[in-house]
Amino acid sequence: MSRLTLALDVMGGDIGPRITIPASLIALEKDPMLSLLLFGDSQQILPLLENIPASMKERLTVCHCSRTIDNEHGISYALRHSKGTSMRLAIEAVQKGDAQGCVSAGNTAALMGLSKILLQPLKGIQRPALISVIPTVDGGKSVMLDLGANIDCDAENLYQFALMGSIFAENTLNLVYPRIALLNIGSEDIKGHKSIRDAAMLLEKDPALNYTGFIEGNFLLNGQADVIVSDGFVGNVALKTLEGAAKNVIALIKGKSKNSLLKPLFSWLLTHIFKESYQRLKRINPDEYNGASLIGLTAVVVKSHGSANSDAFAYAIADAAFQTRQQIPTKILAGLEKY
């Protein structure tokens, strides 16, 4: 395992340092070769670091900045007023070479915009996309993109997403000739928007890609495809629906029902009578799959959910470290040139 420095926007997310700082400590404890640059308000950060071991503290650098990018502002306003914010400074640290990757739970549109401006897309890529690993019910994994970076996409955009997703799956999931599917409202060739049908035609013509056809939302976790492609609007809605359903079912299993009389009954039934199903459901814990990567850029940028808890944000940090050590942007560029 090689030494690595990541830049964190610790002010991003719904709660900020009270989540991101404990997450940083979890990540450092699990990865002894990792160092972190913490961008944010030092008055909020330093009290959370008072009682940590010296060996851990020496791998942390607090970079004070008092400004943040608010989720309430639109993309144009956020970009115009981004100078000196925790998000921009974290990305600039990667641009300058002070860090090799960046993690933020802040405004998705601003993160996408600033990353494109400061880090630049890979040669030939029209639009970077948000990609995430998702679990399957059989214990496997798939990748899904775009998850919200690009709301409107044409056929060429979707084709490029499929290409990047295939290379990403090859290098992160160790898959050979990953199966690609387009997320659609039906499996028939005539279903869906024109852009999706046209993208299907492009994919069918490319023998280098293992395109298998359309996939419907009810089969996303069934392991029928290794790479699931959609525009950012559809992908974001689908992913959040999956995550919400998984969290609600897991809460039910753990006996968190509002009906106190049913709590013990549900918990006992699901952990004893349906034990095998319970073990499968535990694999679909959204916290363990927190973090979507902005692929198609020259460096690793990972977007955490704004509502992530400390364990989930720590997973996003670990994901950024893994991708950086695996040199995923370089491998995507090499793959693009090959195709």
UniProtKB/Swiss-Prot annotation:
Molecular functions (GO terms): phosphate:acyl-[acyl carrier protein] acyltransferase activity
Could you tell me the EC number(s) of this protein?
Answer: 2.3.1.274
| CC per GO annotation | cytoplasm
Q: Tell me one GO biological process term.
A: fatty acid biosynthetic process
Q: Does the keyword Metal-binding apply?
A: no
* Substrates-to-products reaction catalysed: a fatty acyl-[ACP] + phosphate = an acyl phosphate + holo-[ACP]
Q: What is its main location?
A: cytoplasm
Q: Where in the cell is it found?
A: Cytoplasm
**Keyword line:** Cytoplasm, Lipid biosynthesis, Lipid metabolism, Phospholipid biosynthesis, Phospholipid metabolism, Transferase
**What range does the record give for the signal peptide?**
none
User: What family, per the record?
Assistant: Belongs to the PlsX family.
* Free-text function comment from the UniProt entry: Catalyzes the reversible formation of acyl-phosphate (acyl-PO(4)) from acyl-[acyl-carrier-protein] (acyl-ACP). This enzyme utilizes acyl-ACP as fatty acyl donor, but not acyl-CoA.
Family matches, as HAMAP family: PlsX
> What binding partners and quaternary form does the record give?
Homodimer. Probably interacts with PlsY.
Query: Which protein, by its recorded name, is this?
Result: Phosphate acyltransferase
